[in-house]
Amino acid sequence: CKTDLNFLFSGEKKIQIGLTVDSFVIERWIRDRDVFVATARELGAEVNVQDAGADTKEQISQIDYFIKKHMDVIVIIARDCKALSEAVERAHNAGIRVISYDRMVNDADTDMYISFDNRKVGEIMAQSMMEAIPDGGKIFMIQGSASDNNVDMVKEGFEDTLKNSDLKVVYEANCEGWIAELAADYVEEALEEYPDVKGIMCGNDDIASQVIQILAENQLAGQVIVVGQDGDLAACQRIVEGTQYMTAFKSIEDLARQAAEYAVKMAEEGKLPSDVTDTMSDGSYDIPAKVLEPVAVTRDNIDEVIIDGGFHRRDEVYLNIDYDTE
């Protein structure tokens, strides 16, 4: 019997995971990366992280690079959910498992999808606005990229919930590529026609920052109900300052940790763990899905959820006000 001396000297080969990220411009993806990599390393895996720089062609090249490097699992935070199916097919043909992380890759039959309940995000956004805005109030919707599957799900949840109120959506726009700066132009345009707006639904907290800046320039900051999502530090600061009403908080630590655990298990066992029992459609296929719940964070519960939960420090959240008197 021949002994593999390379194996004896080098030790067991580590699991190799490729993580391709849309862009690190949005604050939350940095936290996703850090928790994912740390968890995978704790489990004995190595992670090759690639930044697509908000470029779909670059992300496709990164997936092909991972295939060439014989990764065991590829995890994709998609730039364009509708443009990666052929790259995923090439990975599958090479025997590599693929996970859609937070954004579903459309029509690709990825091995798993892990995200938050994006429809629920829309629901709690609408519920928060319904609680804070008088009947008949006018609302703007400044959403994320139309190429992001999650945007559609958030919109569905928002609009379906809003049907139970007298609030009126009078203006809609999408920030293509999740370019938050576009929101400033949209809101300026909308305010010209609807200066009496009562609420603005924002695709994420980054977009909300641009919206609130324009509201401030028009002496409306704090008077218009603004909601976003992600629990960014700046958004939490705005909430305690009174210029943003709510952020749909999603525990990035839980999402990234579980995604890393599933990636390692899939590499070790060659199949999906048995505790993933739900499915979601990617447009053509029903994909095994793990869906986490978001939480509406307002001034009333920000200390409990964000600070006590360890997501941001109290001195950071209350940086711009005297929190000792709160």
Each language-model region and where it sits:
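A residue-level marker of the well-folded mature domains of exported/periplasmic proteins
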Residues: 1-326
